[in-house]
Amino acid sequence: MKKLTNNTMLGKLTLILNAVVLLLFIISMMMLLKFDKTNQVVISQRAGYEKAYEEYVMAQHPLKQDSAEVAYYQYKLDTLQQKTAASKDEKKTLSETIETTKQTLADKQKQQEQHLAQVAELEKEYGPAHENWEQLNSDNDAAKKKFWVIAWITIVAFLLKTFVFAHWGAKNNQNLQNIAPWMKDGMKPWMSYVAWFVPIYNLIKPLSFTKEVWNETDYSLEDAGIVTRDENSVDNSNLFMSIWWAFLLCSVWVMNFILFSTFFREGAFYVKTNHGSMVVIAIVIMVICMCLETVMILGYNKKNKQLLENESKF
């Protein structure tokens, strides 16, 4: 008699974690839409604010020159007024120069006052606009932070669920190692963890690992006379698992890329897609993926029970 383990509880734990991940994902999508609402306001008002800011800054540029010119002509006037003329002609020239300087100083002061008035007028418009802009950005940052908090919790929950699923697969593989001599040439239990967590490798290997466990279990049940080939063939397991894997890849990689491009970039996805529809599609794909995975786990748990109930035949 070979030693077999009951792994159905690990499968059920995976299902519970799936429900938690799905709930967190839906909440994160709602938070993403709230962020999108404030973010679209910020983006729509950015051009107007930047124009107002540029006008306000440009209006301030002449003030430094005005101050320098007023100071220069004031100093020149003070110097001329302290100067004494040695002759009548020099006195006349000095007097004319003083009058010219006074007039120039008055013109510069008037110009300075005009520029100050323009800045003051622009400040009346820019001040509230700046406060509104700061408030919009503050609200937007707060909404983004709330989303990322939920998003990271969802990611951690998904990684935990993935680990439990990988452990479930490893335990099922170990059962096969114990009852099927030919499995010594197949994948080892530890490869379940490698398949799920090694980048690039995890794009296809989890599917092939799961298929091998499922198919070899079917063969073991047939070989022991517990089920017939016809009974195993009706479930179309290979096609079913391929569809599950396609939805999983789409949910984890494709939709996350689309969501990131839609909500955190300002390119084609942001402009041309309906943001609410993208969220709905992401949720629907996730729900389908979870449903397929649920059916698959429950299906294999049934096979696990069949192995245990007929352990003496191996």
Where are these predicted regions, by residue range?
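Alpha-helical membrane-anchoring segments
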Residues: 3-25, 185-197, 232-252
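Alpha-helical transmembrane segments of multi-pass membrane proteins
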Residues: 21-40, 254-256
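Low-complexity, proline/glycine-enriched hydrophobic segments characteristic of transmembrane helices
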Residues: 33-148
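Selective detector of the "anchor" transmembrane alpha-helix that sits immediately C-terminal
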Residues: 146-169
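Cytosolic juxtamembrane helix at the C-terminal end of the final transmembrane segment
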Residues: 168-177, 207-219, 291-314
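Hydrophobic, aromatic-rich membrane-embedded alpha-helical segments
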Residues: 189-211
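Membrane-interface alpha-helices
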Residues: 206-243
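Juxtamembrane transition segments at transmembrane-helix termini in multipass membrane proteins
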Residues: 238, 244-314
